Amino acid sequence: LYLNEEENGWMELEKPPKRGDGMESRAARHLLRKLRWATVGAPFDWTKRVYEEERAPEVDERIKRACVKTLEIVFGKEAAFVEKGEDKFFDGQVGLANFYAPGDTLNGHVDDAEMNLSKPIASLSLGLPAIFLLGQKSKALKPVTALIVRSGDAIVLSGESRTMFHGVPRVFSDGETLMSSSKTFRFPEALESAFDDDDDEFLLNFAKRTRINLSLRDVR
């Protein structure tokens, strides 16, 4: 199936669209606008709330390196994040990517599907800014801490915060004034310069109207 934008509906193709043709592009662009999450490494079964480790591809080293660097800043290099052995502090085995458009929210929840909750989660933000709420171990408890996270910001959930409720009640749009100051949010020039190919225009426009949150963690 692909979206027929002129007729505002779906049409069935006799065969799948080929890479690079117009129908593939229109189908991909429509689906990209609907994208809300993806897995990095082992797929996550949202129904059973388990990671399918037997089908786990390797996490991209660039993603793992960025998260390890974040943890080194927080805990210090002596924590030995990438040393070989069963007791290493962080391996970055799997990740979840969440995609938010302005108006999207993420309800309060706890990341507790991993077997070892003593290991941290490193969370990286790209694109649009958002409000991040960190609560307590119960939704009924206070206080709740509110932070504005911008593109390039990182959050580490470790220790007590690893099992605390957290969520995203608000995503700002490009050009919107942030509540904490009179400054207007603009898409980072450094991030925009990464889209330097002619074919990247659609991806750049997608990034400008999306918040991407990538959280890396260990299953075991």
Where on the chain are the PLM-derived regions?
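Non-heme Fe(II) oxygenase metal-center motifs and adjacent flexible, charged/small-residue loops
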Residues: 1-220
